[in-house]
Amino acid sequence: MISKYLMVFFIIIIAACSSPNKILKSVNTRFPENPGKIQKLTKGVFWLSWLGKDTVLHRMESINALVINLESAPLTYDFSWFNDHRKTLSYVADSTLAVAAVNSGYFEYLNDGGYVSFHKSKGQVNQEVTIPENHVRFWKHQAAFVQNGEKNFAIIQGNQNVYKQLPIENIISSAPLLISDGVPMGKYFVNQKEGDKSNLPGEHPERHQAGFGPRMAFPTTPDRRLILLSVDGRSPSAQGINAEELTDLLYHHFKANQAINMDGGGSLTMFVRGATPTGVVNYPSDQRKINPDGFDHIGQRKIGMALLLIPKRKVLLRRMEKIKVTVDSLAMDYTDNPK
């Protein structure tokens, strides 16, 4: 009888495994003509990428994922804030010798209210939500990605009062919450059958979450993996994804039991040192403001916060120093109050 229960237990664990190779194989079922690529960056850290026709969504998609084994990866995680002097991700990642990095929370500062998100790093509050509760963007801080201990990450629901009282050193608020305790909430919170959302303000939650666009997500898995995932958009070669579809991708193929949507759009940037001249591996959408047909790795938006993966070991830091990172030739400033 004990053997029977043990067998069931191990079957469940194996089924929920989110190893990089299992993820690659699973997502490849959606890209039969253009299977993904996998590259080991350092111990416990893998970069996965797909570019081509997604046969589930029936659209062209560009997906990049950093899959991190929290138990074995020799990394420190820097919840970097530089919203007082915005920079490109590749500049910040290069100057800190990061092996990889992504943009993180919503950093905009609005003339009609101020900041839309909360940010705390190394125990210091860098940014507080100042927009009023009736503001169309108030929803953007209703969840948070937090680090509680060197290797422990969680995704929580809350508000600024909750975040300020938490005895946690690193917090980035964002929204929407996509998966909570194994429940794929992102599949249900927007009614896709209510018709065209174009009459709503661009940052209204229903329009934001129903629209196909560039998106960043931070999921975690039951087997102690952190995944940083980007899906490009606003191009015929990468047509974007909505919150429901993103939830489905993370839940079924990455086996995530927690996930949060982070800042996307033109801010979406993923950096892998040495992968391209600038380190950027996704296709920043702001470049198409200059060249409508542009589809390459330049045109980063200057952002105000990021999550940096920095090596602990001196030998890896020295290796990072030797990899040259070039300046983005088309870095874009962000307009906080677009018309």
Predicted regions located by residue number:
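Zymogen propeptides
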Residues: 18-156
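Conserved beta-alpha junction segments in alpha/beta enzyme cores
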Residues: 51, 56, 177-223
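Structural recognition of the beta-strand scaffold that forms the well-ordered cores
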Residues: 99-103, 144-147, 153-155, 217-219, ...
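Conserved, well-ordered active-site substructure
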Residues: 111-139, 199-258, 267-319
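A substrate-binding/cap region within the structured catalytic cores of diverse enzymes
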Residues: 132, 136-195, 205
